Amino acid sequence: MIVVQEEKNLLKAGVFAELTLADYRELEQAISKKLKAQRKLNLLLDLRKMAGFTLDVVWEDIKFTRSHPHDFARIAVITDDQWIPWLSWLGTAFTDADTQTFTDADAAEAWARGR
């Protein structure tokens, strides 16, 4: 399950349980809608309650990220999982966004907002 919140210069998404392709497509739609209103997007992903993801999500993420190489300014990822920072690092090959991982939600949100 995914919960997406739109704010002025930030799109926040929290993932609960397993991230499925349907969940990821919901995030894609929110991103695409937000990008129609602004040139670059700051994204905050809270993955602390994510229990895993399906393999089709990985492929969809690669395709989506490659189709938006210059559309993100900052991507903040909140996680306690040791593998997520590594996966985030791999994703930087497809985007010029400044990407950081955090364990503290407040620090992640402040950074994503540019503070």
Labelled PLM ranges:
Residues 1-115:
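Amphipathic, Lys/Arg-enriched alpha-helical "gate/interface" segment within cytosolic domains
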